[in-house]
Amino acid sequence: MLLRFAYNKGDYPEYDEMVKNLSNLVDVLPFAEKQADEYCEAYARAHRDDKIQYLIGSGNLWGPTYSYAMCIMEEMQWMRTKSVTAGDFFHGTGEVIGRDDRVSLFYGEDAPRPQMARAEKFLHTICKNLTVFDTAKYELPGIDKKFRGLFSPIGLGGITGRIGVYLEEYGKHPMPIRR
């Protein structure tokens, strides 16, 4: 909706092209989820019962990272998490992560990729349990490269949706059960 306002003011000439790409997501997202499914299952199986999980996301993936950690992993699966942006990671969280802690990085296709890469590079020196979820890894036929960054949160939603299904299965904890 905001992009439409920008278009109406003459500030977003790519609006019609973006809407066309957005309409292609309906067919493309199941394809992306299928590509990620095996990786998501392996992650959930291996890490369902980890003591704590740190999740790092930035840019337009910060909101989905934060909400996935809090709403799905904590509230619906009773898992301990800490979510942080790549920029804030170096202001505290990076000091408390141990060698055996689980850290997941959620890479999008927008401007903060270099920050994410910097956090990942540092993490390789202090932690042996990193998992990278990168929306750029998945083919999205019908989506122009210039819009992939804009649509990264939707792609991550498909990936985390698959993780959630497997966390529920391996934890034997149905999502609707809360305290």
Regions found by a protein language model. Give the residues of each.
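A SIS-like phosphosugar-recognition module
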Residues: 1-179
